Amino acid sequence: MMLIPMASVMAVTEPKWVSVWSRFLWVTLLSMVLGSLLALLLPLGAVEEQCLAVLKGLYLLRSKPDRAQHAATKCTSPSTELSITSRGATLLVAKTKASPAGKLEARAALNQALEMKRQGKREKAQKLFMHALKMDPDFVDALTEFGIFSEEDKDIIQADYLYTRALTISPYHEKALVNRDRTLPLVEEIDQRYFSIIDSKVKKVMSIPKGNSALRRVMEETYYHHIYHTVAIEGNTLTLSEIRHILETRYAVPGKSLEEQNEVIGMHAAMKYINTTLVSRIGSVTISDVLEIHRRVLGYVDPVEAGRFRTTQVLVGHHIPPHPQDVEKQMQEFVQWLNSEEAMNLHPVEFAALAHYKLVYIHPFIDGNGRTSRLLMNLILMQAGYPPITIRKEQRSDYYHVLEAANEGDVRPFIRFIAKCTETTLDTLLFATTEYSVALPEAQPNHSGFKETLPVKP
């Protein structure tokens, strides 16, 4: 609305209805601003209380020997193909289909790579394999030959990933089928060993006395860090100290976005709900539980959409989630899976990671899907006796990359990523209480001479 200079008042006669409407708009705007400020000043439960709730939930699980024993022995039970390991792989996510010229260049690069390999120039060969797949990520022959190359370097995890990707594109590719039949049991063995290592660290954390002051301090710090990183992943610009200020003083940070500050309050409310209501509750996870988590996550930012499924189609990167008419049905199937024997027989980290991925794949909400999925993942971990984990904002690129790889057909890299985050959280807790970290097994053992790899993006 344009304000009229006082000198022009005599020259311009404003209709009465315009004046009334203007006052109505100003009152509405002022009410919205005051509402946001009041939300920031609402009493927030002490962070220490929430940390104690987490600790209480973890220690309550000690009184359930059957559940604890089940979690400890899951790693020895038959596993699905969704294995977990700390190692990375060359993740090849097809952004677009290769052009005819790109396919020709990829073919030429593959031929050169094979020639360099024959001559023993393996470093050059690797670069050429990577270039071929950069030009055409769906080039099945290049995927298979690069898998063979990786297997020769004892990089079994990467080789298996490449064979799997080739079979996703061409399910009856004979060479890829034969090679993957050879690598899959090896990968599963490596992954099962990693499960055992993670479980040994969980037992160490659970053996720390409840009253340990160092553990309480690090849990409190972890609480702040979790909120900071989970909102930062979504683009929130508040610093860790600003988030601490909001939660400790219950006052707004001057000059910073009220929406971003309300996101912090929403995360705090959702975590409080999980810690005090869901963690130690016996029974199935329901759609209502997921909606209640989301209602708190988004309630201070968008109360209209909070706690309700989206009614419009959305696009998430290169992923097109289900049509809004199918969301409720898919959520019912998702919750049915959450409470199924199949899911319960998975290792807790695998179960939590798959739940995260399945929920974010459905993308049932207009906003807040990532935060809600990460909270659900931590709920599952805590119910199994694990501490809540944090995906750091510095891992954002890798996090989204493995999600894209899962959308392309192989969810295992995503599960491995979550497993590594779990290990990092456990190491943080054990390092803070040093006496309990003695004689822990190395989390990334070089089993059977297999080579360590890092995620490499073409």
Swiss-Prot record:
Glycosylation sites: N275, N446
Binding-site list for ATP: 234, 316-319, 367-374, 399-400, 407
Outcome (variant: H363A): Abolishes adenylyltransferase activity
Residue positions of the active site: H363
Topology within the bilayer: Single-pass type II membrane protein
Record flagged with keyword Lyase: no
Family label: Belongs to the fic family.
Assembly information from the UniProt record: Homodimer. Interacts with HD.
Name the UniProt record assigns to this protein: Protein adenylyltransferase FICD
Organism the protein comes from: Homo sapiens (Human)
